[in-house]
Amino acid sequence: MAAAIMAAEQEAAKGGGGRNRGGVQRVEGKLRASVEKGDYYEAHQMYRTLFFRYMSQGKHAEARELMYSGALLFFSHNQQNSAADLSMLVLESLEKSDAKVAEDLLENLAKLFSLMDPNSPERVAFVSRALKWSSGGSGKLGHPKLHQLLAITLWKEQNYSESRYHFLHSTDGEGCANMLVEYSSSRGYRSEVDMFVAQAVLQFLCLKNKTSASVVFTTYTQKHPSIEKGPPFVQPLLNFIWFLLLAVDGGKLTVFTVLCEQYQPSLKRDPMYNEYLDRIGQLFFGVPPKQTSSYGGLLGNLLNSLMGTGEDDDTEEGQEDSSPIELD
């Protein structure tokens, strides 16, 4: 098999354009036949050999396509380790090439992620590198489209907390709301239906994503079976969030201040709410930052990781301001 593969690979190295692609297809055919016979180890090693040969020849696209098809093939035969290894090589081909971030490439990466064992360490390493590459070297937290695709996969796996994190770094407020409705209905207490969306809205606003904050609130309150039609709402916290979104659009500090004072009983339900609101006051109402946080320890660390450090508050709204931020 190795001799046949190498002969096909040498043919692929000749010429250009369609002829090159024809050679790659012949290589794929030989490798597929080997995998179908169950020669997994030999096929895996040959994929790796061809990858490094293509890369050394500057054939980054061919290397990427071959590794992607190989990874899918190994996944289809439940060869998780080999598939994960080739998935990492797909990323390596992207990292070492001048390939631009494009939707089809993001979809390919999300597809590989969806096929990996959810509990494997390789998946954690893969998503970290994929997000870093998708940021285009900007130092941001990854492309919002990739975050959206990852969020959808994690939602299907009922990994709601991780799905929520990625939705918050996407621009898909509607998808986030639909996931939160399911999350709240299946895992939450009826008394906390308002808290699921309140946290999401406040964190979207801390990320300067007003549009998604508004969409997630409207969609969630319309679709959640335990929330009566509003506004106004039965739950005071939902009324606060509704007024807050209106106040953010208006930008009047006095309105924001009175609003926070009037709804303190509701805001005390979660000690992080006032910390988020301190940040929102800085971003949208010109409130100067506090010299020291009122919280230390775990809460202080959580808030600092949410807000990032040293970020520029004057950047554009939404994903244009995705400075290093972690959300629990």
UniProtKB/Swiss-Prot annotation:
GO molecular function: protein carrier chaperone; protein-folding chaperone binding
Subcellular location: Cytoplasm, Cytosol
Record carries keyword Nucleotide-binding: no
InterPro entries with a match to the protein in the record: GET4, TPR-like_helical_dom_sf
One GO term of the biological process aspect: protein insertion into ER membrane
Acidic residues bias locations: 310-320
Role summary: As part of a cytosolic protein quality control complex, the BAG6/BAT3 complex, maintains misfolded and hydrophobic patches-containing proteins in a soluble state and participates in their proper delivery to the endoplasmic reticulum or alternatively can promote their sorting to the proteasome where they undergo degradation. The BAG6/BAT3 complex is involved in the post-translational delivery of tail-anchored/type II transmembrane proteins to the endoplasmic reticulum membrane.
Record-stated family: Belongs to the GET4 family.
Subunit architecture: Component of the BAG6/BAT3 complex.
Protein name: Golgi to ER traffic protein 4 homolog
Source taxonomy: Eukaryota, Metazoa, Chordata, Craniata, Vertebrata
